[in-house]
C-alpha cells in the first residue's frame, strides 16, 4: 500500500503511542501485556484462586469481562441513570469456577467496580491503560469470531451469508479505538454503516441538531476507516461517494453491499493480532518473565512462544471433544477464524477442521448448565511452526488489482494460491449497474473478472521453525489445492446472540 508511511503500525495503535522505533514498540506492547498479567495475578489473590483455578480459561474470561465492565463508562452512566431492581450499578460480577471434592463448582462473585479499577490501575503503574483493555476486547472478539457465525446478522442488514469471511471483529464494542478499527473486517464496517443509515432513514432527527452533527462526524469517520481497508482506487472512490452523500439512504446501502461483495475478490486490508487470555500473561509474569524488558510483539513469534509453554485448562461439557475445544481456542488466540484451514493446519502441525465438524460449543458456560456433569482438560495450544501475521488481504500484487482469497481473510503471511470459482462470485453481481457510481462499479467488476485464481499471494513468504526467532529461513509450504479451506463453509455453527 502506497500510504504505508502515513500509517502507524498495529502495535502503535494497540498502545496508543505516537511514532516509535521497533524497540520502543516492543517495550510498550510488553508493558501492556505485562500489566494484564500483573492484574490477573492480583485478581487470583483477591478471589483466592488456586493455581489450577487460575489457569482455567473460563475464570480468565470472567475476570476479563469484569474489568471491561468496570471501565465501560457509557454503560455505567446509563445504569446509574436507569436503575433496575435488584441490580447494583456500582458492582459487576460473573461465574468463578472452583475445584471442590473432585468436581467443578460454580460460584457467582460480585465485585465493586471502583475496586476493580483500582486494582487494574495499580497493576498498570497507576494509569488507565486503555490499550490493555482494548487488547482484552480483541481477544474476546477473536474468540467470538472462531465460535459463532453471523449469518443472521448478515441477512438482517441485507447482506449475503456467504460474506461471513468479511465479518472479523463484528462483536467488538464501539469503544475499542484505533486498535479495534484495525482488526474489523470489511463486512463488519459495512454492517455498522448500514445500521447507521437505516436509523437515519427511520428517525428524522438522527442527522439533525447538535447530536446529529456528532453522528455525522462518526459516520464520516467510519467511512474513512472502511475506505482505508480497500486497496483499489475504484473501491476507494466509491467510498468517497458514500461518505459525501448529503443524506444517506438506500442508494448508499446498495453501494456498500456492492463493495462488500467486491471485497470477496478484491480483498480489504484487515489487521490480525494474536491476543491471548489474561491468564496466559499472568502465568508468564508469575514465573518471573519481564515483558517490558524483553519486549513483545502481537504479530511475530512471541505469542507462539508464550503458548508453547503455558498450560491452560478448560471446562468440557459431557459430549464435547477436548481436541476440538483446543482448536477453537487456538484459532481465537491467533485470530485465525477466517484463515485458510490448510495454512492453519500446516502451522499448527495438526489438522484444523471446519467449524461444522467440531464437537464443541462456546467456551463460556451458561448459568443454567449443570456443573455436576462437567469435566476439565488441558487445552493444546502449541504449534509446529510460527508465521508473521498479515494485514494484507492476500492480494498478489498491489499494482494491478488481483484476487485475494475468497471466503478467507488471510491471517498469516504465507504463500498460497487461491482456488476460487469466479463464476459463483460474479453471479452475485447481477445487480443494477446504473446510478451515480456506475463507472466505478463497472471498473470494479472488470477488475474482478480479470483476477486470476491461479495467482499466488504472499509470494515467497513462509512459516518458520520455533527456534528461528529472527525469521531467517522461511519454509514455503505446498498445499493440496483441491479444496478451498474455509472454516465456516457448509456450516451449522451457533449464531452469536448478544
Curated annotation (Swiss-Prot):
Gene Ontology terms, MF aspect: RNA binding; structural molecule activity
Entry GO CC: helical viral capsid; host cell; host cell nucleus; ribonucleoprotein complex; viral nucleocapsid
Compartments, record wording: Virion; Host nucleus
InterPro entries per record: Flu_NP (IPR002141)
Segments of this protein annotated with the region Disordered: 1-22
SUPFAM superfamilies referenced in this protein's UniProt entry, alphabetically: flu NP-like (SSF161003)
Pfam family, any one: Flu_NP
Highest taxon above the source species: Viruses
Residue ranges annotated as motif Unconventional nuclear localization signal: 1-18
Motif annotated as Bipartite nuclear localization signal, chain positions: 198-216
RNA-binding listed as a keyword: yes
Protein function: Encapsidates the negative strand viral RNA, protecting it from nucleases. The encapsidated genomic RNA is termed the ribonucleoprotein (RNP) and serves as template for transcription and replication. The RNP needs to be localized in the host nucleus to start an infectious cycle, but is too large to diffuse through the nuclear pore complex. NP comprises at least 2 nuclear localization signals that are responsible for the active RNP import into the nucleus through cellular importin alpha/beta pathway.
Subunit structure: Homomultimerizes to form the nucleocapsid. May bind host exportin-1/XPO1. Binds to viral genomic RNA. Protein-RNA contacts are mediated by a combination of electrostatic interactions between positively charged residues and the phosphate backbone and planar interactions between aromatic side chains and bases.
Family statement: Belongs to the influenza viruses nucleoprotein family.
UniProt protein name: Nucleoprotein
Gene transcribed to yield this protein: NP
